[in-house]
Amino acid sequence: MSVSRKRIDHCNDCANKNGSGWRIVNVKDVTYRKERCSDVFKHEPRCQCGCQDKHHDRHDPCVPDECSKTDKQLTIVSAVNPTSNLIIPEAGVLPVPVNNVILNGWTLTTPDLLNSFNPSTGIFTATESGDYEINLVLSFKSSAFLNATENLSNVPQVSIIDAATGLPLNEAIQGFPTTSSQVVVDVPVVPPIPVLVTVTSVLGVGQISLSIIISLSAGQQVEILVSSNGLSHIPSSFPVGPATFTFNTGTSLIVKKVRNIPKVIYSLC
């Protein structure tokens, strides 16, 4: 029995063009050493566009847009500052309603050449099957001071969801940051008894980062959901009314197409 090196070759950008998928090929020792010690397959012949993509021989014809060069990710969408707001209802209404909002009204910072993102609705549509990286930086600002429960069960949440099911992708869900402080409260008896109480509140200004790499099918749609999660607002002054979270300053969304990189593995033959 001998041990031979095998390499798994797969390109999720061109596999569907000729019906090929994952394939295992034998790798000679000299080739293995070259691949181990080279940067992005320096020993491979260049294609017409001048890149060094391992799978350039499968492109027909070979064009720069299909070749990854040294960057194995292609930015598809770059957008900022959605105009939608999250309304936090006034306390006193039972049961406390849960308000949800899909972030929309985005501004594109680069051209959407694939027409995969609708900035008005905030929906991203995968133009082909494969792996995608989604990076969200959510900057928020509240119009009022908002108390949360001590166990954080009603803290607002942001999630990257499948538009068809409404479920988070790869558990991509995160609560808003909070802070806790201790205050002295007088118990209304005679004489008053001071009691130290811990108060938990949602930050009035903050930022949340969410990043996932997810396999999407062609036509699958993704959107960003922000939920009040049962949080309510207790007005401290008149006029009374709901509180609002805005996200139109410092928020960004970037979607990238992830290309697969060949891996070298060992197998017994």
Curated annotation (Swiss-Prot):
It comes from Acanthamoeba polyphaga mimivirus (APMV). InterPro entries: Tumour_necrosis_fac-like_dom. Gene3D superfamilies: 2.60.120.40. This is Uncharacterized protein R623. The lineage of its organism: Viruses, Varidnaviria, Bamfordvirae, Nucleocytoviricota, Megaviricetes. It comes from the Viruses. SUPFAM superfamilies: TNF-like (SSF49842).
